[in-house]
Amino acid sequence: MASSVPAPSGSVITVASSSSSAAAAAVCGTGSPCAACKFLRRKCQPDCVFAPYFPPDNPQKFVHVHRVFGASNVTKLLNELHPFQREDAVNSLAYEADMRLRDPVYGCVGVISILQHNLRQLQQDLARAKYELSKYQAAAAASASTAPTGPQAMAEFIGNAMPNGAHNFINIGHSAALGSLGGSASVFGQEQFGNAQMLSRSYDGGEPIARLGINGGGYEFGYSTAMGGSGAVSGLGTLGISPFLKSGTAGGDEKPNGGQ
């Protein structure tokens, strides 16, 4: 039930009984009136609507609210709200009153404008960062789409890079040139060269291994045991300095003479 209480300043304050009366009674029971009643110089009743929200230890809060909005308007607003909404309403009024006293022209609008400007700036920065990131992602996706993937694609890539499927790996120990090989009686140069190894191209039946050695070696050609052979290297044998061919373990016993 609401009742009107005249204030010393001539304004009328409406006091409504609500569930917050217990909190107001606890404040008033200590003998110290709430900040609103103390400022208005009146006795704080147990059902005072201001007591739960304007404690006596923070009088400046009610002073600012009363100066900007007026005590009667605040009382009317609190009476129209539910008890669980009053605390948020009082805090909003106190903040807005404080900002209005700091900036009489703009008040809270000035702070809101600054925050909105900062928000727009951050949104623009975020959009630019997303645009730059999308460019890098598009470039990475294009590179991944053009790169060969899988064993078959890798084989095609190697086949295109090396026509006719030839895979030659030559390691030369010393910087020198090999003499030309001509016919069945090819003659190497007399100078001492380093060891040279050449891996010929792969055949369907296995992986042939060819070695070319100059320093007291010769020429050997055969198949490794990985191809399912007998284990011993078979082939044409060794080609020394003289132009003779000697059969290997798997070859025949024929020897071409020097006149061939």
Curated annotation (Swiss-Prot):
Which cellular component terms (GO) are annotated to the entry?
nucleus
Report keywords, A-Z: Developmental protein, Nucleus
**Stored PROSITE patterns:** LOB (PS50891)
Tissue expression, as annotated, is:
Expressed in leaves, leaf primordia, immature ears, immature tassels, whole ovules, silk and husk leaves. Found on the adaxial side of organs.
Question: So which domain of life are we looking at?
Answer: Eukaryota
InterPro entries per UniProt: LOB (IPR004883)
User: Where would you say this protein principally sits, based on its record?
Assistant: nucleus
Q: Which part of the chain is the LOB domain?
A: 32-133
Q: Where in the cell is it found?
A: Nucleus
The cysteines covalently paired via disulfide bonds are none
- Role, per record: Promotes the switch from proliferation to differentiation in the embryo sac. Negative regulator of cell proliferation in the adaxial side of leaves. Regulates the formation of a symmetric lamina and the establishment of venation. Interacts directly with RS2 (rough sheath 2) to repress some knox homeobox genes.
Q: What else is known?
A: Might be partially redundant with the IAL genes.
Describe the protein's quaternary organization and the partners it interacts with: Interacts with RS2.
Which family is it part of? Belongs to the LOB domain-containing protein family.
Q: What is this protein called?
A: LOB domain-containing protein 6
Species name for this entry?
Answer: Zea mays
